[in-house]
Each structure stands twice: as structure tokens, then as C-alpha cells.
A protein has these predicted regions:
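Basic (Lys/Arg-enriched) interaction patch that binds polyanionic ligands
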Residues: 151-157, 161-167
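Nucleotide/phosphate-binding catalytic cleft detector across ATP-hydrolyzing
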Residues: 1-154, 171-222, 226-282
Length: 282
């Protein structure tokens, strides 16, 4: 049995992804349900339209000692197990209207076709009307209401994966990831070592960038999210080594799912995702 998640900040509004079509009258129908999903290595978080955050639970196929982890280092390694997990978390939450949901799923930066195929297989049981993906780092920026008019460095320290990205004009301009996370801290992996890997990555991004964007973003400061943002030692080492302000996101562990929810709300306002009259009969 999973405990009820604590109330989380509502996702901030974001602009429409496309301009509305005003010269056509659209029939008034109930919209399809919307789901925002952050499927992490350690925890899975689900946001449902009209309800908010409905699940914040360990990413295991089943509760108890027999459960296995279907996501490792950010990658889906067991699509069937991940589907069972989501089915368990969503039980009793989705409306019985027959309308197929619109889903926004966070994905690690730089993930390839294998990850997207696994994600598609995981969500197949939902019979989604549409599946939209959003890079976790961009979701973090949306979820915190960050100003995307200026270059921004986002560092998302998850349980087993750290993603570092430069956002420019609201899009991912450069990104890297490392297979280290907050759950690795302890023993031979220290907060200083984790921060050092981030510093090395940012330094490389500075060398590779032929524009002033990365340097401008570094002067602006880092936006830090994920479970690692709740570790004062990680924040301290990053700020000291990079000599720049490090701003932990509000409720950093749910920033990505809040951003996915913000993207979902914007997408559902577009006429292309207007309610499908045939959904109720499928």
C-alpha cells in the first residue's frame, strides 16, 4: 500500500504551444483525461488532470520483497513490469468514460529509440490517444516557472542518474548525463565526487560552446532539482567549485512531474487535441 503523497505546488501556467484557431467553432465536449508521468529509477510520480499529484511511490513492479525495479539509471529495462507498476498506481483514478488519455512522459536527455520504444510498450495498456515526451531537464524548468528567455543551466540529480543541460530559448541546446545520483552517495561515492562530475561536465560544455550562452547561464546560476537538491552537501560543493549561485528548485523531487503537467495543460488547449467524439464508443 502506498502512502498518500503530500500536497505539491500546482504546475505554473505556460504559453500555448501553438496559436489557437479562432475561425472555427469547436463542439463542446468533455476533454480526454490527461496524465503526466515521471518514471524515475527510484520513484514514480503521476499527475492527473483535475486531481493533481495522485502517486509518488517507489519504482518497483510490486510491493513487498518480490518486487523488482523496472527502471535503472533512467532507462526502462522491464516495460511489462513498468506497466504493472503504473496500472497499480492508477487503479481507481482514471474515469470510466472510455475516453483515451493524453499522456506526457518525462524522458532522460539524449535517450534513443530503444528508450522510446520501451516507453511506448509501457503505456500501451492505457490505450493513450496521444503520448508526448519532454526532456526531464526542460520539465524541471517549466515546473519551477523559470525564466526561459535567458540561457539557463539545469542540473537534475536523480537517484541513479544526473542530467546537466543548457536551455536556450526554452529548448535544450546542449546536454550530458552521468550514471551517478543521490542514491549512490555513501561509501566511496561522496557528495564532493558527485559535484566534481557535474563540474567536469559543465567545464566541458564551456569549452565546446562557441557562443557565450553557457557562460551567461553559469553567471546566472544553476537550477538544481531532483533528490540531490535536498542534500545541503551537494549544493555546497557545487556552489564552491563552480563559484556561482546554486538554486534548489521548490519541492525539487517533484519539479519534473509538475513541469510535465504544465506542458500537458498547454497541449490540451490546442485544437488538435480537442475531445474526440468517438472516444466514448471505443
Amino acid at each position: 500500500m502506498t502512502s498518500s503523497p503530500a500536497p505539491q505546488p500546482a504546475p505554473p501556467p505556460v504559453p500555448l504551444l501553438f496559436p489557437p484557431l479562432r475561425d472555427r467553432a469547436w463542439p463542446v465536449r468533455r476533454p480526454s483525461p490527461g496524465l503526466a508521468i515521471d518514471l524515475g529509477s527510484a520513484r514514480t510520480r503521476v499527475w492527473l488532470s483535475g486531481r493533481g499529484l495522485i502517486a509518488d511511490a517507489p519504482t518497483v513492479t510490486s510491493p513487498g520483497p518480490g518486487g523488482t525495479r523496472p527502471v535503472r539509471r533512467g532507462g526502462i529495462v522491464d516495460a511489462e513490469g513498468a506497466a504493472r507498476l503504473l496500472g497499480r498506481l492508477l487503479a481507481g483514478h482514471l474515469p470510466r468514460s472510455g475516453r483515451r488519455p493524453v499522456v506526457v512522459l518525462t524522458t532522460p536527455v539524449g535517450c534513443g529509440g530503444d528508450h522510446r520504444a520501451a516507453a511506448s510498450a509501457t503505456l500501451e495498456f492505457l490505450r493513450p490517444r496521444t503520448v508526448l515526451t519532454i526532456d526531464s531537464v526542460r520539465a524541471v524548468a517549466l515546473g519551477t516557472g523559470a525564466d526561459l528567455d535567458e540561457p539557463l543551466l539545469v542540473v537534475d540529480v536523480g537517484a541513479r542518474l544526473t542530467e546537466i543541460a543548457l536551455l536556450a530559448g526554452g529548448a535544450v541546446a546542449a546536454a550530458h548525463r552521468t550514471a551517478l545520483g543521490a542514491a549512490d552517495l555513501g561509501g566511496s561515492t561522496t557528495a564532493a565526487a558527485l559535484a566534481g562530475s557535474v563540474v567536469e561536465t559543465v567545464t566541458g560544455m564551456l569549452r565546446e560552446d562557441g557562443t557565450p550562452r553557457t557562460l551567461d547561464a553559469l553567471h546566472r546560476g544553476l537550477l538544481l532539482s531532483g533528490g540531490g537538491a535536498r542534500r545541503p552537501d551537494v549544493v555546497h560543493h557545487l556552489a564552491r567549485r563552480l563559484r556561482t549561485p546554486v538554486q534548489p528548485a521548490p519541492a525539487p523531487h517533484t519539479a519534473a512531474v509538475r513541469g510535465a503537467a504544465a506542458a500537458l495543460l498547454a497541449a490540451r488547449r490546442h485544437p488538435a487535441l480537442a475531445p474526440d467524439p468517438d472516444d466514448a464508443h471505443r
